[in-house]
C-alpha cells in the first residue's frame, strides 16, 4: 500500500530544498510506504540517487525502514541536521562530537561565515565556559555557538548575548513548558 505522489503534496518548485530534506518531508507526510520510484520522480533524480540519500539518512540516525515496496520513516533522530532547516543549510553546522563549538565557530568566523551561523554539537570533548572554565558537555545536551556580527559597538556586544539567553529561556518556558533558567551570563540550564 503506497502513497500516491499527489497525496504527499509534490511541488516541482521546491527544487531548492536539499535532497535529504525533500526525502524527509515526503516520508513524514506519507501515511504509508513511499516507493523509490515515487521519490525519484518527485525529485527528478534516479532511484539509485534516492537510495544513496536514504542510506546517508540511515547512517545519520534516521530510522527509515526499506523494503521491496519502498521506504517509511518510523521516527526521528535527536539531532539538528542542516537539511532540517531549508534556507539555513549553509549557516547551520552540526557535528555529533567536537572539541568545542567555540573553536569551530571561531574558525568559521575567521573564514568569513555570515551573521547568525550556528555550530551545534551532540557533545563536546573540551567544552568551555567563561574564563576558559571547563563546561561538561556529555551526550544528550544541546551545545551550540552562534557567530554574531552585530552592528553594535564592541563595548555593548555582551548585552546582545545576555538578551538572547533571556529570550531563549523564556521561549522554552512559555512555548514548551520547559523549566529553563539563565545561569549568568549566558548559559541556559534545563532541569
Predicted regions and their residues:
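Short, Lys/Arg-enriched N-terminal segments with co-localized hydrophobic residues
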Residues: 8-18
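Catalytic palm active-site di-aspartate
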Residues: 178-191
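Extreme N-terminal basic, low-complexity initiation segments
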Residues: 1-8
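N-terminal lobe of the biotin/lipoate ligase/transferase fold
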Residues: 20-174
Amino acid at each position: 500500500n503506497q502513497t500516491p505522489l499527489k497525496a504527499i503534496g509534490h511541488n516541482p518548485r521546491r527544487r531548492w530544498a536539499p535532497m535529504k530534506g525533500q526525502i524527509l518531508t515526503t516520508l513524514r507526510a506519507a501515511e504509508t510506504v513511499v516507493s523509490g520510484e515515487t521519490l525519484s520522480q518527485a525529485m527528478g533524480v534516479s532511484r539509485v540517487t534516492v537510495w544513496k540519500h536514504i542510506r546517508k539518512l540511515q547512517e545519520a540516525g534516521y530510522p527509515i525502514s526499506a523494503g521491496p515496496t519502498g521506504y517509511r520513516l518510523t521516527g526521528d533522530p535527536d539531532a539538528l541536521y542542516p537539511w532540517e532547516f531549508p534556507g539555513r543549510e549553509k549557516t547551520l553546522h552540526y557535528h555529533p562530537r567536537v572539541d568545542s563549538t567555540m573553536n569551530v565557530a571561531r574558525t568559521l568566523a575567521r573564514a568569513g561565515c555570515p551573521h547568525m551561523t550556528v555550530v551545534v554539537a551532540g557533545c563536546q570533548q573540551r567544552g568551555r565556559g567563561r574564563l576558559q572554565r571547563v563546561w561538561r558537555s556529555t551526550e544528550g545536551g544541546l551545545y551550540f555557538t552562534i557567530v554574531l556580527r552585530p552592528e553594535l559597538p564592541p563595548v555593548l556586544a555582551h548585552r546582545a548575548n545576555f538578551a538572547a539567553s533571556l529570550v531563549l529561556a523564556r521561549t522554552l518556558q512559555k512555548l514548551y513548558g520547559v523549566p529553563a533558567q539563565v545561569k549568568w551570563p549566558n548559559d541556559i540550564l534545563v532541569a
